[in-house]
């Protein structure tokens, strides 16, 4: 299903670990590849442009990303297909892929477009939905969940040690409808030393809300359970994560799956040059595994 109401020109995502990921899939073999988190299409563009014997199916839950990628990849329209779907719900049928790639987390355009409600630095409705057709919003969680559930959410998904203080302040001051209102309330709930630390005091709470709104960790686990069966023998899966919760799930899933052999004993990290040109790449980690060949 394709979106027709998005504005592709507003969706420009800087791809992280682009060549490391694509080359890690061994694209010289050609064949079909699955881009499970299409985003702005950067990884797929590199694959399609440098390996003409490849074809791509691109998935994304965000219709704005699909629209942007259709524009970016129009030179390869005979070799790429698009589906508006969460990768956890994808059904490949009988197709088997030589490679599967996923670049997880929120994209730069989603952060930068204030109206999406992902950023605590820009005023916007408390939304945070990657798929605008989904029902649950960040406002619903903040305004309707009880204090204990909020604290547990912020602790588990945000790894925030001050989760109880923050949840108490949210309940005391709600309802909240705007991102900056919530951000300021969180900042007021924490000690002054914490308020002016290395990261903004709302960072982890906003991460927790985003993960919950979009069901990110459940979707990732479902995808990791299913994706190895979508690979041809010897095919590879490459996954980029941006925080420890994702990376922990990926590491244990790849190591514990007898359908796969782990290629990267330790995750591949961005170079200093990439971090300097794109500071958001700093926390990225790339892990790669290969589908085990059937026993003869």
UniProtKB/Swiss-Prot annotation:
Gene3D superfamilies linked to this entry: Putative methyltransferase TM0872, insert domain (1.10.150.170), Vaccinia Virus protein VP39 (3.40.50.150)
Enzyme Commission number(s): 2.1.1.199
GO molecular function, one term: rRNA (cytosine-N4-)-methyltransferase activity
GO annotation terms (biological process): rRNA base methylation
Broad enzyme group: transferase
Localization of this protein: Cytoplasm
Annotated function: Specifically methylates the N4 position of cytidine in position 1402 (C1402) of 16S rRNA.
Protein name: Ribosomal RNA small subunit methyltransferase H
Natural source organism: Synechococcus elongatus (strain ATCC 33912 / PCC 7942 / FACHB-805)
Gene from which the chain derives: rsmH
